[in-house]
Amino acid sequence: MSNKVIDTVSEMVQPILDNLQLELVDIEFVKEGQSWFLRVFIDSDDGVDIEECAKVSEALSEKLDEADPIKQNYFLEVSSPGAERPLKKEADFMKALGKNVYIKTYEPIEGNKEFEGELSAFDGENVEVTVMIKTRRKTINIPYDKVAKARLAVSFN
């Protein structure tokens, strides 16, 4: 059910975003406690402000009310992805080159399933992350198809 909702909402929101020159980062449809939330994360090269989020929310809300693809009651939230933006598409990884990232893999690579460090290279097939182990830097090569989850990571160093 959740994937169908996400696919439907993605198709509905894309023309709105194209018109405003914004990018769809992610969509979540989740139940928290007794309430359902439809969260749409948007961005642009210059970031997004509250007015752009409101425009997208209003336009999408109209389309959702018309088509009524979600039967249960839910709250619609439109926002920026924040500082720890998810990396979902190849283009996201390219934009994140040189930045601090967190990557979780489906299976252990060199004994670990979680990595945090600088995204040093990406070629569409492999993700290269430079991590600090004690006082030395080590480069880990992760096959792109083994990445379960990836996001930018805020570093306080």
From Swiss-Prot:
CDD domains according to UniProt: YlxS_C
Transmembrane segments: none
GO biological process, one term: ribosomal small subunit assembly
Places the protein is found: Cytoplasm
CC annotations in GO: cytosol
Tagged with keyword Transport: no
Pfam annotation, one family: DUF150_C
Role of this protein: Required for maturation of 30S ribosomal subunits.
Name of this protein: Ribosome maturation factor RimP
Organism: Bacillus licheniformis (strain ATCC 14580 / DSM 13 / JCM 2505 / CCUG 7422 / NBRC 12200 / NCIMB 9375 / NCTC 10341 / NRRL NRS-1264 / Gibson 46)
Gene that specifies this protein: rimP
